[in-house]
Amino acid sequence: SEAEDKLKTVIQIDPDYADGFMRLGILYLQQERYSEAVENLSYSTKIDKKDFNKFFNLASAYNYMKEWDKAVTAAQSCIDIKKRFGGGWLELGIAEMGRKNKTRAKRHFEEARKDRDWRKMAERKIDEINNPAKYEK
């Protein structure tokens, strides 16, 4: 894609441009190219260890790949940087659901709920735990 080509050019010119790697990772996430997303997002967190958003997107990519332990680590890094960001708590909860730890997951979704931007998604996840039959396909 054109966006992919431009981002690849940008990071070739400046291999320390963490946001370029993050944006490429997000693009791959959207395209469901999860291993490439992880590769770029992981690299972006090595360059810039202070941006919660990079760790949030990395956690999301790991969750899509069902790499629960790595998702937990990335989500925890996100939360350590920005405690009130609901997205980090949501990804942490999703990873705990993957680990079959519903009690812990619910606690994390309750934290995510405190962030207005993430409330609806968190409430949906809590409802999935409380009423699993409703969501069975």
For the regions a language model picked out, list residue spans one by one:
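Structural marker of alpha-solenoid helical repeat scaffolds
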Residues: I13, I47, I81, K114-D115
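Structural signature of tandem alpha-helical TPR/SEL1-like repeats
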Residues: S1-T9, Q30-Y43, Y64-S77, R99-E111, ...
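N-terminal leader/targeting helix
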Residues: V10, Y17-Q30
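Short coil loop/turn residues that delineate tetratricopeptide repeat
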Residues: D16, K50-D51, R84, D117-W118
